[in-house]
Amino acid sequence: MKKLRASVRSHKKQPANHKRRGKCALSSSQAKPSGLDGLAKQKREELLKTPVSPYHLFSDIADVTAFRRNLLSWYDQEKRDLPWRKRVKEETNLDRRAYAVWVSEVMLQQTQVATVIDYYTRWMQKWPTLQDLASASLEEVNQLWSGLGYYSRGRRLQEGARKVVEELGGHVPRTAETLQQLLPGVGRYTAGAIASIAFDQVTGVVDGNVIRVLCRVRAIGADPTSSFVSHHLWDLAQQLVDPARPGDFNQAAMELGATVCTPQRPLCNHCPVQSLCRAHQRVGQGRLSALPGSPDIEECALNTRQCQLCLPSTNPWDPNMGVVNFPRKASRRPPREEYSATCVVEQPGATGGPLILLVQRPNSGLLAGLWEFPSVTLEPSGQHQHKALLQELQHWSAPLPTTPLQHLGEVIHVFSHIKLTYQVYSLALEGQTPASTTLPGARWLTWEEFRNAAVSTAMKKVFRVYEEHRRGTCKGSKRPQVCTPSSRKKPSRGQQVLDRFFQRHIPTHKPNSTTQ
């Protein structure tokens, strides 16, 4: 039992994952290199000495010009109508324009465009300027961000807004270098996107979509997360960016990767740069090689074992995959598995509807500052989960209910690095009247208040299980597992107080009125 830890009080503090929009680890949002000096410069010089075949480069300026022209022409006709693009186009104030780009880029990290649109619209309506965001509470930020995932993004965005307002005179840094230097949570990609789109700085960007486009047009099959390939991709992006329309070019490259040059089933026949694509040429080469007298097609001049950009000899070209051979995905560790028991505690509300108990997570670590149902972390075996959960509930105290602890089902939620399985329970408190004082770190909410509170997607899944069960639509076991204090034999000294569990009342408290 010593290994059973109450997650609401002592959950292992691990930083939330900050992966960018499908982006490989080419640049960390935590890193702040303003230039290449010392060891970084030496390492880059060594990398630059590594031979690279022209096959993986844009050696002909005519190809660069054609790539820019074709891509921008396609973008002008096919670009999606997105709210942040409209706002940037209409906004004349440079700081507000940069803020609009900044918010969109942070929200789009590892999140689909369709999901972001509604969040972005509500965010900009609530906080249209950096000053508005800087004056908001973290609770309000978490509340609006609820369900978007990677919650530290919202917190870092607000930290950046406050720094701009309080330390930089309300002016957003104008270059990618200073953006990355001065603003928390702004890495190389985000800095380049803001600088090029808002300020027209001629600087390239590399995110997951751009990686895919560049790897295919130049047949780069090596691991895109390696230092050598990373440097090469950033160099290509900088070489290709259009000096007259850098922001549009970068958005066009990302748009191409998102809508045409997709991870699976790319629409090559609709690609504006198909004629310049080495991967597409490689597919054609395979078809022609079966014909007599087929012409030679350009290939990498280096031996595959020597070239650090070609497909590795251990994982060569697969004709069945076509252009999807590029880029090859780096191997990922599976998320570690964790287990938790969580309980939806309810009592009658003043208006007749039920109130449910939420407690706040620590201010650092996974899901920092968000609200959740009382929960405990379990051993993989799941043994003693009832007892552990009752101990956690006892922490919040009130008279012992006659209703048993009831098992409702199981919820599985996968974070970027954790697969968390929740065993969901409910507990009904009878005849309780909320008091007038607030117990720190806890609140009673109505169902409607819960839906608008700063809670994670995992807790929303838990609530749905509880809601379905309460409405009689849950398709769980006909004989749900239950545990009551009276069912335990010879309770320990620490458990003897369960007959007074929930001794102090926890009052109703609206989500936006809790102090941090």
Curated annotation (Swiss-Prot):
Major location category of this protein: nucleus
Domain named Nudix hydrolase: residues: 335-467
Protein name: Adenine DNA glycosylase
UniProt-annotated location(s): Nucleus; Mitochondrion
Active site per UniProt: 105 (proton donor/acceptor)
EC number(s) reported in the record: 3.2.2.31
Pfam families reported for this sequence: HHH, HhH-GPD, NUDIX_4
Source lineage: Eukaryota, Metazoa, Chordata, Craniata, Vertebrata
Family from the record: Belongs to the Nth/MutY family.
Catalysed reactions listed for this entry: Hydrolyzes free adenine bases from 7,8-dihydro-8-oxoguanine:adenine mismatched double-stranded DNA, leaving an apurinic site
Function: Involved in oxidative DNA damage repair. Initiates repair of A*oxoG to C*G by removing the inappropriately paired adenine base from the DNA backbone. Possesses both adenine and 2-OH-A DNA glycosylase activities.
Motif extent (Nudix box): 376-398
Region annotation (Disordered) ranges: 1-38, 474-516
Cofactors (names): [4Fe-4S] cluster
Gene label: Mutyh
InterPro entries recorded: A/G_AdeGlyc_MutY, DNA_glycosylase, Endonuclease-III-like_CS2, Endonuclease3_FeS-loop_motif, Endouclease-III_FeS-bd_BS, HhH-GPD_domain, HhH_base_excis_C, HhH_motif
GO molecular function, one term: 4 iron, 4 sulfur cluster binding
Keywords: 4Fe-4S, DNA damage, DNA repair, Glycosidase, Hydrolase, Iron, Iron-sulfur, Metal-binding, Mitochondrion, Nucleus
